[in-house]
Amino acid sequence: MPSPSRIGIIHGALGAFAVALVVKSGQVQLWQGAAWAARAERQHFAAATVLAPRGRIVDASGTTLVESRELVRLSVAPPELKSPKTLAAALVRAGVPRAVAARASDPKRKWVAVPGRFLPADVAKIVPMRGVYAEPAAERVGVVSPSVRRLVGRLDAAGRPVDGLELALDSALRGEQGTATVVRDARGRRFESPTAPGTAARPGHTVALTINYALQDICDRALADAVSRMGADGGDIVVLDPHSGQVLALASRRPDPRTSAATAISEPYEPGSTLKPFIAAKLLELGRAREDEVVNTHNGEWVLDGRRITDSHKAPRMTLREVIMQSSNIGIVQFAARLSPREEFEALRDVGVGMPTGVPYPAEAAGTLREPARWSRTSPASIAMGYEVTVTPLQLAVAYAAIANGGELVEPALVKEIRDADGAPVFRHARRVVRRVI
């Protein structure tokens, strides 16, 4: 039996320990309480970004051209796994290659990012597992028309716009991200807190294009048939309302299927004889020629300054009207000689040659029309025949629309309307006349 002195010593030691414990507890609560509480909150709570659903792109009638589909990215911390074999089997069932599943469940590895993105339903049993970390992602899905895909554009693996209307209209489509507080339980699983403060994500706007998908499909098939029959490398079709400026269809076809841009907007070419009507319009406007005025067309062959000019439709003489109808090179060169280089330049610049049209497309090409000071001695004749100049198919369509609508150059439009998540319009296309040209 311990002596009274030893018992006293033990009691004293226990009392001193109790006092020290009370003092330390008070110190922790009074002086360090806030710091420890913050540390505990950090361990159990975390801030998370809530992705905003990207807005849809639809055609003029409301048919969906592209929309977002919610997906999930997975990462694994193998040392945290409770049952590596269970995870490996679940990953294989979700379509993950066995080699990747084995890597993700190897406890010797610290962290494994599982390649690819998954439908939430396919990984619903995987996401709650301890050691599995899920991150929301999205995928753009829509119609299969290559022309529409080129016009709409692409997103990269991180969901950022790369080109096309996805890039041009990103501020309207991307929405606003929200925030949420995530709670970790004892097993490391994460759940969104139902009580902690957060902000709701605001979905992106819906963008309605001027494109009519049914008409677009007709143009795609017609273009494919024409390219095949003609043995051509490619082609473009632009269908434009000459009065409103709305682009109703925009089909492009190139031999390389990887071509990512809408070439009717992005690839200029020499227009050739299609520019002759604008030279004729300038002549008529300035009173330098009459429709029935006749010039010598030399039976289809003529030499000017040592340069041989020919016509496919051979005739000794033609009126200005016939020159345009038969696309006579000889006739238009002789008539165009009545214009100064500056006047000939203005005839084309006025209808938009060499200038961007104003459509919201990042890769739009302006084409080329050099200032008269940079012309050579043969340039006036070449340009009258549509050479030494480049235009895009859209530019040429806009120029011809000015003839069709009575003389006004109307800015083309690809976007008909933009609506917010509630369906309220935030933008509507309105006809814009750039200038009167004829």
Predicted regions, residues:
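Conserved, well-ordered alpha-helix/loop/beta-strand core segments that scaffold catalytic motifs
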Residues: 191-235
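Small/polar-residue-rich segments within soluble enzyme cores
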Residues: 30-31, 75-76, 80, 85-98, ...
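Hydrophobic alpha-helical transmembrane signal-anchor segments
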Residues: 2-35
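Short, small/polar residue-rich loop motifs at catalytic or cofactor-binding pockets
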Residues: 44, 49-53, 177, 231-235, ...
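Short, basic/aromatic recognition patches
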Residues: 35-51, 215-229
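Short extracytoplasmic
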Residues: 45-71
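Beta-lactam-recognizing serine transpeptidase/beta-lactamase-like catalytic domain environment
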Residues: 185-196, 235-273, 278-438
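Short beta->alpha transition motifs characteristic of CBS
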Residues: 52, 68-75, 155, 249-255
